[in-house]
Amino acid sequence: MRLLIVEDEKQICDAVAKSLYDAGYEVDTCYDGEEALEYILTENYDLIVLDLNLPGMDGMEILKELRQSNEETKVLILSARGQIADKVEGLDAGANDYMEKPFHLQELEARIRSLTRRKFVQKDVCLESGDIMFDTIKRETYAKETKISLTRKEKGILEYLLLNLGRPVSQEELMEHVWDASVDSFSGAIRVHMSSLRKKLKAVLGYDPILNKVGEGYKIREESDR
């Protein structure tokens, strides 16, 4: 398992790297934003621990650049920026988790274990329900065989709902599995992405395929629900 630690404070970076190396990971380190982007675009990493306040290039810009061509590598933001707006921006830009400084190494290692476990869970290539089909490899969505353009988070929501057909999925579950975090303050972000997803699907299908069951959560509408 190969990790990259991007952190401009050398003492913190080296301490994290040593802890993860001792835990059995192969670890590279980088203290500069521009150098980090070069590493990321030329090497293959399973997970990146990414600071935001970096010399040379801001961590958020690095993340956005990465996600233009790579949705598979896990990214855990580790930053002193602790405002809700910072967390929302980071998660919406494609981070899988967001951890504030100061932090405990044990918690960081636990989050890394959780993220890397999820990466290697075997999934069906295509998930289907009625007129909806989601290709988990190509990350493409079809409704009545018409390709629909969805954002990264909308795809994540739809994928998780299709993986859990037949039961409502709570906002807390979506937060944990789509955003890889469990922060109550992001429930508004879920509603925004959910509303957009439902509108896009309804425009093609002619009906809203997602039910909101009050007090329970969201689920894909099935024949028994119509």
Task: Please identify what each model-predicted range represents.
Residues 35, 215-219:
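Glycine-rich nucleotide-binding loop
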Residues 113-126, 166:
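The C-terminal output helix
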Residues 126-128, 133, 168, 191:
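Short aromatic/basic micro-patch
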Residues 1-119:
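N-terminal/domain-start alpha-helical segments
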Residues 140-209, 214:
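Positively charged, aromatic-enriched patches within helix-turn-helix-type DNA-binding elements
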Residues 43, 106, 130-132, 137, ...:
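Structural detector for helix-capping/boundary residues
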Residues 128-155, 219-226:
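A structural micro-motif at secondary-structure boundaries
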